[in-house]
Design a protein with these regions (language model features):
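Non-catalytic C-terminal accessory region of glycerolipid acyltransferases
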Residues: 25-157
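Catalytic core of membrane glycerolipid acyltransferases/transacylases, capturing the structured
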Residues: 1-22
C-alpha cells in the first residue's frame, strides 16, 4: 500500500498471492468494526471506479458487489448514497480499455492527483439502518444501486 494513503485507505489486494484472501478478510473485518463503532467509510461498491469501455462512450459503472450488502448487514450501519462529480483522466480511461492491471495500477495516480483538492459531490439519499430493506447481501447491493440510479443520471453496465 502507498504509505501516503495508509491513514485514509483500507487496503484491498487484487493479486492472486497466497495471502491476498486473508488480507482482504482482515480489511473487511476492519471496515465492519469501524462501522459498528460509528465510523464512516467510502467505498466503490462496484469494486472499481466507473470507466469508459469505448472511445466516445460515457463512463459506466459495473453492478455493485455483494460486499456492500455484507458491510451493511453485518454492521447495521446507516447508509448515505453519494455521487461524486467528474471522472478520472482521459489517460486512465484509455489505459483501462487495454488491461485491468494497468487500470488498477493507475488508481493510486488518480487518487494522489486529487488529494487535498476540493471534490464536488451530491448526497442523494440518507438511509437509517431501520429503513434499509432486509435482503441478502447481493440483493441489497443491487437495490441500493437502483436507488442511486433513480436519483442521478448514471449508466450501469
Amino acid at each position: 500500500q502507498e504509505p501516503l494513503l495508509a491513514d485514509n485507505i483500507l487496503p484491498i489486494e487484487f493479486s492472486n498471492r497466497n495471502n491476498a484472501m486473508r488480507e482482504n478478510v482482515y480489511t473487511r473485518k476492519t471496515a465492519i468494526e469501524l462501522l459498528k463503532n460509528g465510523g464512516v467509510i467510502a467505498i466503490f461498491p462496484a469494486g472499481a471506479v466507473a470507466w469508459s469501455r469505448k472511445k466516445g462512450l460515457p463512463v459506466e459503472e459495473e453492478n455493485w458487489k455483494p460486499m456492500l450488502g455484507r458491510l451493511i448487514n453485518q454492521s447495521n450501519c446507516d447508509v448515505m448514497i453519494t455521487k461524486f462529480e467528474g471522472q478520472n483522466s482521459k489517460f486512465f480511461q484509455i489505459a483501462s480499455r487495454f488491461n485491468q492491471i494497468v487500470r488498477q495500477s493507475l488508481y493510486l495516480y488518480e487518487i494522489k492527483k486529487s488529494l487535498d483538492k476540493p471534490m464536488k459531490f451530491n448526497i442523494l439519499k440518507y438511509l437509517k439502518n431501520e429503513d434499509i430493506p432486509k435482503m441478502n447481501d447481493k440483493s441489497l447491493s443491487l437495490h441500493l444501486q437502483r436507488e442511486l440510479k433513480k436519483n442521478v443520471n448514471l449508466r450501469i453496465k
